[in-house]
Amino acid sequence: MSSPEQRDEVEMLATMLLIRRFEERASQQYQAQKIGGFCHLYIGQEAVVAGAVAATRPDDYLITAYRDHAHALARGTSADACMAELFGKATGCSRGLGGSMHYFDKANHMYGGHAIVGAHVPLATGMAFAAKYRKEDRVTLCFFGDGAINQGGFHEALNLAGLFKLPVIFICENNFFAMGTSVKRSTSLKEIVDRAEGYDMPGEVVDGMSFREVRDKLGEIIASIRKDPHPAFVEARTYRYRGHSMSDPASYRTKEELEKYRLEDPITRLRAQLTREGKLTNEQFDKLDKSAKEQAMASVKFAEKSAEPPLEDLYKYIYAENDETSEPAPATGRATKPAGRGTSAKNRRATGRTASTNGDSA
């Protein structure tokens, strides 16, 4: 398994560049009306997920909210599968049925992508409980925005995690705005990290614009959790350069504020650090950036050529039933035939089960 020391920083810079170029290309495709529904971009926040993933092992669990493209890419989901999902194609990481807010990649232990604000936080607690119950050496990373910290389920989940000493890290990506509402107008506490004290778990603040600070602090916390399981809370102070979603002009922010944070661009900062230390040349950076742009462009072409999900698959993945459970699509961007079709809708009605959907919206 990889450790933080083994993760090459140049490799993680390449991941951050891929996230940036993918999101820029997604923005263009959304404006061209090739992507429907909602689309939340991660531009500016790349250091948070890159640093966190660099501190984990591939078998650790990861779950996040609706701004999820970057988390999938950082965990190893292909750009092809990610873009195809945005296009609603069968080769997408959720077979074209999830869209932007519902990425899923079981092979890389990336469990969403959840549209309802804060609704996935209890799931993270459950995943950590399962790992501890099974005596698995796994840590769960749960990402959410500052807008989730006042949801009821958030408090219940952190209380149980603290009570049962579960191996989970709750990572608040505090970009200072819940949609257009400043955190100062929505939260009584001056410091979000102070929430941790109420659940008897350690709390840390990190500069979310610094890859190294995020990686190093998460590495320390994870090492502590592996030694003696317990939950932790991390407030990563970061900034998104775009609006809340593609429909948001972000008029609630000043140009001066935006320019201030652009000077702290996480990609520029890591590049400068590596260059000063003699680990990266300008030519090497240009090559990394070119590769990221090519991958993003290739993902668009892949998505355009991919097939639509067949109509008969519309209700196929609602139920998981014993040996007929359908496995999720692999993260290669290629569709595979599901293991089974499951029970028909008619038979389900006959058993008296009520239908449920995963069609969350926000």
Region spans (language model):
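Glycine-rich ThDP/TPP pyrophosphate-binding loop and its adjacent helix/strand module
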Residues: H109-K305
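Generic preference for hydrophobic/aromatic residues in regular secondary structure cores
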Residues: M101-H102, F176, M201, I318
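Short secondary-structure boundary/hinge segments and terminal tails
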Residues: A47, L73, M179, E213-V214, ...
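A ubiquitous, low-specificity "background" feature that marks scattered single residues
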Residues: A52, A74, K132, M179, ...
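Cofactor-binding active-site loop characterized by glycine-rich and histidine/acidic residues
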Residues: E24-Q28, A32-F164, S182-S188, V193, ...
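Mixed-charge, polar/low-complexity N-terminal
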Residues: S3, V10-E11, T15-M16, R21-F22, ...
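Conserved acidic/glycine
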Residues: M1-V48, M246, A250-S251, K255-A362
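A general secondary-structure junction signal
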Residues: Y66, A236-T238, I318
